[in-house]
Amino acid sequence: MPEFLNPFSGKLPDRKLTLEELIRAIRLDLAAEHEAVHLYMAHADATDHPLARKVLIDIANEERVHAGEFQRLLNLLAPDEANLMAKGAEEVDEMKNKLGL
């Protein structure tokens, strides 16, 4: 998550990212959103303070919206992404059907 110890984490490169580099960066951003959801929900589950739980769950849900935005951008930048994700979903559906669920 935070990279406060890395003095170069906020430094801009001396050139623009290539499309492939941007795609990798967006994948990393997407992973960070999922990690944030996990962290905030774990904190919410670990407390019985009602206001803290409500705020943490609300923030986690906002991160899920961000994840959707990054996923959509990734699908637009890498056209094969949506097809591969759909293939993965089909494989899970096949397993589900074999189990009769």
Region locations from a protein language model:
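Iron-associated oxidoreductase/ferritin-like identity signal
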Residues: 1-101
